[in-house]
Amino acid sequence: MAKRIDISGLSAFYGNHKAIEDISMTVEPRSVTAFIGPSGCGKSTFLRTLNRMHEVTPGGRVEGKVLLDDENLYDSNVDPVTVRRTVGMVFQRPNPFPTMSIFDNVAAGLRLNGSYRKSELNDVVEKSLRGANLWNEVKDRLNKPGSGLSGGQQQRLCIARAIAVEPQVLLMDEPCSALDPISTLAIEDLIGELKERFTIVIVTHNMQQAARVSDRTAFFNLAAVGKPGRLIEIDETERIFSNPSVQATEDYISGRFG
């Protein structure tokens, strides 16, 4: 079941360096929220705080709260591994496990969790590949290496792998930046279908993509050179692109900087 995310007063650090500062927002369930802003403003850092991946970076730490349907993901008794099962992630470049078959790529998380019997794996793998709009393209070569697929197919394989463990939230960090236009369109169409089942957050440098796929858009920017990134504005996507409330948002969208 898709879940709502409430973030309050969140700051993230790399050692003594504060990367983002005092971010508060709500991400609605069964919707797509896009993060836009210039390079280095903390979009991807913030995205990684939502499933505690930021802590994997040496010196990475977080202050503030991230509530997933009222459960604080940063409570001391919450296991980060459990968080990452609940909040899945798709990275910028397709990263199928190179030595694994297509089938094993999708089944990897299920086997790691030990949550399915071997007899159930076939059905779950097929369901996940269908959910990623990839089944018809690979059903006759499931035992072939996932690395042999095209770039767009590899990214959809990674999405299938992410949704196989049934997360409630799906984070996407520039999922189309390494893909050609046709593959990008396939991923964008897939995002529109997946939001019926998941809460989706996407980081993108492509403002046209944000306008096409998202329901709400958040604009991030640096407070000043050398200062932490901050959330400048979040609103319905149509409003952000047609009548933003903050001048800096309009300047960025119109290409005056960034």
Swiss-Prot record:
GO biological process per UniProt: phosphate ion transmembrane transport
Domain ABC transporter: 5-247
EC number: 7.3.2.1
Catalytic activity: phosphate(out) + ATP + H2O = ADP + 2 phosphate(in) + H(+)
Organism domain of life: Bacteria
Main location: membrane
Claim: ATP-binding is one of the keywords in the record: yes
Matching InterPro entries: AAA+_ATPase, ABC_transporter-like_ATP-bd, ABC_transporter-like_CS, P-loop_NTPase, PstB-like
UniProt binding sites for ATP: 37-44
Keyword terms: ATP-binding, Cell membrane, Membrane, Nucleotide-binding, Phosphate transport, Translocase, Transport
GTP-binding is among the record's keywords: no
Membrane topology value: Peripheral membrane protein
Subcellular location(s) of the protein: Cell membrane
Any single GO CC term annotated in Swiss-Prot or TrEMBL for this entry: plasma membrane
GO molecular function, one term: ATP hydrolysis activity
Family in the record: Belongs to the ABC transporter superfamily. Phosphate importer (TC 3.A.1.7) family.
Quaternary structure note: The complex is composed of two ATP-binding proteins (PstB), two transmembrane proteins (PstC and PstA) and a solute-binding protein (PstS).
Known role: Part of the ABC transporter complex PstSACB involved in phosphate import. Responsible for energy coupling to the transport system.
Record NCBIfam families: 3a0107s01c2 (TIGR00972)
Name the UniProt record assigns to this protein: Phosphate import ATP-binding protein PstB
Organism: Streptomyces griseus
Gene symbol of the encoding locus: pstB
